[in-house]
């Protein structure tokens, strides 16, 4: 509601001002002569002073009332602006919520289409990294037929199935959209051969027995009790073998490790290398290269500070 144009206080103030004006005119036109005496002069001065004080008080009252009206109007306008701002915030929040819901529905719909559509299914499978392992072995372990929806394939589980092949060290399965499944494998490489009651076993650098077959040329024999990835003697022997320079490693016919502290190597020409423990292996390998240039049958590098030849 708008404020009334004239309040009761304003009317009283205006009436008082009008009365003062009339009194002033009466005094000016028909008042007593100032020369009538000093006895009448005192009351007139007091009346005039009182009128001036009343007028000043009325002016202050009017000014205060005006200020009050302006402050009230300003406050009312502020509340209106705040109400409008709150309304705009609610509208914007509702719009944002509707947009999020719409995008979520679109994403769900698109995901459902891609999940079930035959356009995003396996049409070809590409296998790379095979050598001894055949593509048929990989596809058989993969066990994902053509026509399978790509989004329905658990690639980690598929890679684990392929890696279960004994000769496979690692496998990776990737979906290449729109319709290709790619399988990448890394085959195990033999670094030693161990002979047991059931024949020869190929051992890789991690101590994994991955095949029962004759070793390829240049693969040394591993002489330990029972090779295994966590067997200490197997790990020690393979650590020494893989630390040798390639040209020297090719000359090794056998590496024996009855214990982790008594490792020996036998070369193709029958010479023996006493290695000892796996400590300071790099130094021992470096000293052995120079030591083998000297004639002898036994080369002892178990103490690399004092290598000997016999």
Swiss-Prot record:
The lineage, from the top, is:
Bacteria, Bacillati, Actinomycetota, Actinomycetes, Mycobacteriales
Q: What is this protein called?
A: Cell division protein FtsQ
Q: Which residues form the signal peptide?
A: none
Q: Where are the transmembrane segments?
A: 96-116
Q: Which Gene Ontology terms describe the biological processes this protein takes part in?
A: cell septum assembly; FtsZ-dependent cytokinesis
Q: List, alphabetically, the GO terms of the cellular component aspect.
A: cell division site; plasma membrane
Where are the disulfide bridges?
none
Residues in domain POTRA?
A: 120-188
